[in-house]
């Protein structure tokens, strides 16, 4: 993961600021930086989104392809996650430097979506045991400026909201053989319900307090962080500790409560933005180099 080197004086300055609920950029401990969300940014995908969180820049594309259901879940489709850490994001990702981080992020996404409540995978089934939709979720890290997991989870949810899957009809002839017919109408499609798709809230322990949406400088002052996967209703679906340090049980409970509280606000803001952008349709102004 991208990192910065700080002097002891800089670390003391950051830690003391956090204790007083006044971070270097003027935010409080539970405040996010400005989040920019843009959907439908890649034309050759079923759905896409780009999220900028401070200096962190994430692009997510979703492609729907037909596949065969898994043996243990014959009536469901499934999601596959791929994470590419661009060398332009940080020099540390040159060569195979970003492979470990990409695998770590993909595994975290699998854990978050490995339950029946996040996405109704039965809507992706075309013909039980024979055909289903497979959603390939490609995550590209364009720039790393701290708080990667939160930005990625926001981008994934926005891209899934933007995803349109062609409606399919299964036709059976007199001999019992089946034919699959895809609708030619681009508006005749199915959409996933993302109401229960969680977002990650990362809480970094700095000194005796914890902060959300840490910058690279703040991450350098933290020995342990807690990733909390929260739904729009404030339900925690998954937790994971990262970092070399340890967390006492009381701190974990406090961080969970903060994650639930902040997560509900994050979901409400994201939902408002994507619905507003969709309502504008072609009239919306596209920004960024993909516009």
UniProtKB/Swiss-Prot annotation:
Q: Predominant location of this chain? A: nucleus
**GO biological process entries:** exonucleolytic trimming to generate mature 3'-end of 5.8S rRNA from tricistronic rRNA transcript (SSU-rRNA, 5.8S rRNA, LSU-rRNA); nuclear mRNA surveillance; nuclear polyadenylation-dependent rRNA catabolic process; RNA catabolic process; RNA processing; rRNA catabolic process; rRNA processing; TRAMP-dependent tRNA surveillance pathway
| Keyword annotations | Acetylation, Cytoplasm, Exosome, Nucleus, Phosphoprotein, RNA-binding, rRNA processing
Residues bearing N-acetylalanine are 2
User: Where is it localised?
Assistant: Nucleus, Nucleolus; Cytoplasm; Nucleus
Q: Which residues carry this modification: N6-acetyllysine?
A: 116
Q: Which family does it belong to?
A: Belongs to the RNase PH family.
Q: Which PANTHER family match?
A: EXOSOME COMPLEX COMPONENT RRP42, EXOSOME COMPLEX EXONUCLEASE RIBOSOMAL RNA PROCESSING PROTEIN
What's this chain's function?
Non-catalytic component of the RNA exosome complex which has 3'->5' exoribonuclease activity and participates in a multitude of cellular RNA processing and degradation events. In the nucleus, the RNA exosome complex is involved in proper maturation of stable RNA species such as rRNA, snRNA and snoRNA, in the elimination of RNA processing by-products and non-coding 'pervasive' transcripts, such as antisense RNA species and promoter-upstream transcripts (PROMPTs), and of mRNAs with processing defects, thereby limiting or excluding their export to the cytoplasm.
Identify this protein by name: Exosome complex component RRP42
**What species does this protein belong to?**
Homo sapiens (Human)
Q: What is the lineage of its organism?
A: Eukaryota, Metazoa, Chordata, Craniata, Vertebrata
Q: Which gene encodes it?
A: EXOSC7
């Amino acid at each position: 993961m991208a990192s910065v080197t700080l002097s002891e004086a800089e670390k003391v300055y950051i830690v003391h600021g956090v204790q007083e609920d006044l971070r270097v950029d003027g935010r409080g401990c539970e405040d996010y930086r400005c989040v920019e969300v843009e959907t439908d940014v890649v034309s050759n995908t079923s759905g896409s989104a780009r999220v900028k969180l401070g200096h962190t820049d994430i692009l997510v594309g979703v492609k729907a392809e037909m596949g065969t259901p898994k043996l243990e879940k014959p009536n469901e489709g499934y999601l596959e996650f791929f994470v590419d850490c661009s060398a332009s994001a940080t020099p540390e990702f040159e060569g195979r430097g970003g492979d470990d981080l990409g695998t770590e992020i993909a595994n975290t996404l699998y854990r978050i979506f490995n339950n029946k409540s996040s996405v109704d995978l039965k809507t992706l089934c075309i013909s039980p045991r024979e055909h289903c939709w497979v959603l390939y979720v490609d995550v590209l890290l364009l720039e790393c400026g701290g708080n990667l997991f939160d930005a990625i989870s926001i981008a994934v949810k926005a891209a899934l909201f933007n995803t349109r899957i062609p409606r399919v009809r299964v036709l059976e002839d007199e001999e019992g053989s089946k034919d699959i017919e895809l609708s030619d109408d681009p508006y005749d499609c199915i959409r996933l319900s993302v109401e229960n798709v969680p977002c990650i809230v990362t809480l970094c322990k700095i000194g005796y307090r914890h902060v959300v949406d840490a910058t690279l400088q703040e991450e350098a002052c933290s020995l342990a962080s807690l990733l909390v996967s929260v739904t729009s209703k404030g339900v925690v679906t998954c937790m994971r500790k990262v970092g070399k340090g340890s967390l006492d049980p009381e701190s974990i409970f406090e961080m969970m409560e903060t994650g639930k509280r902040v997560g509900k606000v994050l979901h409400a803001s994201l939902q408002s933005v994507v619905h507003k952008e969709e309502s504008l349709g072609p009239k919306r102004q596209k920004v960024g180099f993909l516009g």
